[in-house]
C-alpha cells in the first residue's frame, strides 16, 4: 500500500497524507487550499471525492494484492472551506473473492468544525466497490 501511495502523484500534489492504516482500513488527511475552492467559496466536490478515493485505495490495497476501484459514489452532506483540514476514514464492509465494499467518511477537523455535540462535522459519505486484479480459484474460502 505504501508503494502505491508513494507513486500516486495526484494525491501527493494535493498534499494528501496517510495518517493511519490497518487491515481493511486507512485514514488520510488533506488541507483545503485556495486552489480547491469552487465558485460558491466551498471545497470543490471533486477534491473531496479524490481524498475519499485515496483513503479507499489504501484500505482496499492493505491486504497485499493489487486492487482497483470497480465503482464509487459520494454523497455531499455539508460544505468544507478553505483552510479546513479534512480527514477521510475508510473501513472495509465486506470482501469476498475479488470483490470488496468500503465506506469512507470525510469530516472537517479544522478549528470550529465540530458540531453542537463537539464531534467532527461530516462533510461527505463515500462508498467504493473494489476489484482485486488477481484471479480467485473456484472453491476458495472467502477472505
Model-derived regions, located:
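Hydrophobic beta-strand-centered segment that forms part of the acyl-chain substrate-binding groove
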Residues: 57-87, 92
Amino acid at each position: 500500500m505504501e508503494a502505491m501511495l508513494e507513486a500516486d502523484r495526484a494525491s501527493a500534489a494535493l498534499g494528501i497524507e496517510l495518517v493511519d492504516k490497518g487491515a481493511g482500513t486507512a485514514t488520510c488527511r488533506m488541507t483545503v487550499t485556495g486552489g480547491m475552492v469552487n465558485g460558491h467559496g466551498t471545497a470543490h466536490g471533486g477534491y473531496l471525492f479524490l481524498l475519499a478515493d485515496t483513503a479507499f485505495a489504501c484500505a482496499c490495497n492493505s491486504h497485499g494484492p493489487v486492487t482497483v476501484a470497480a465503482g464509487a459514489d459520494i454523497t455531499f452532506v455539508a460544505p468544507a472551506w478553505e483552510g479546513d483540514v479534512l480527514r477521510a476514514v475508510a473501513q472495509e464492509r465486506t470482501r469476498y473473492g475479488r470483490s470488496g465494499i468500503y465506506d469512507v467518511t470525510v469530516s472537517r477537523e479544522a478549528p470550529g468544525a465540530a458540531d453542537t455535540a463537539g464531534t467532527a462535522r461530516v462533510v461527505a459519505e463515500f462508498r467504493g466497490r473494489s476489484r482485486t486484479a488477481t484471479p480467485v480459484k473456484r472453491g476458495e474460502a472467502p477472505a
